[in-house]
A protein has these predicted regions:
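ATP-dependent carboxylate-amine ligase
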Residues: 1-124
Length: 124
């Protein structure tokens, strides 16, 4: 919440676009609803699949749980299971003045450098 609150202040009149990569299957299972509630502070949310780190997958646990929680709390969310597709998806959705922020403990921070070249030939 604090990070998105700060992003909101920095964005001014622009939208806050949050890209969230859940970290660990157990945390995603246990805290999906709380993550979803907090992420509604962003104007638009993009959720990727779970960064597993040391954990094995848990049946039925994916980033879709967080995506569904964002929606259930009244937010706007897009589930992008394949993180490699996220820069292209974002390039088609961001607008001039948007602040795009990546959140997560995995490799989600790699998205920014991949997104920038896609935006160079647009107005975003």
């Amino acid at each position: 919440r604090a990070t998105l609150g700060a992003a909101r202040r920095v964005a001014g009149q622009g939208r806050v676009v949050a890209c969230f990569q859940p970290h660990l299957f157990t945390r995603t299972r246990d805290f999906a609803d709380g993550f979803g509630a907090a992420l509604t502070l962003a104007d638009e949310v993009f959720v990727t699949d779970v960064y597993p780190a040391r954990e094995e997958p848990i049946a039925g646990v994916s980033g879709r749980l967080v995506h569904d929680a964002v929606l259930s709390h009244g937010g706007s969310s897009c589930y992008v299971a394949d993180k490699a597709m996220l820069p292209e998806v974002l390039a088609g959705r961001v607008r001039p003045g948007d602040l795009v922020i990546t959140l997560g403990a995995g490799d989600i921070s790699l998205i920014g450098p991949l997104l920038l070249p896609l935006l160079q030939d647009t107005d975003a």
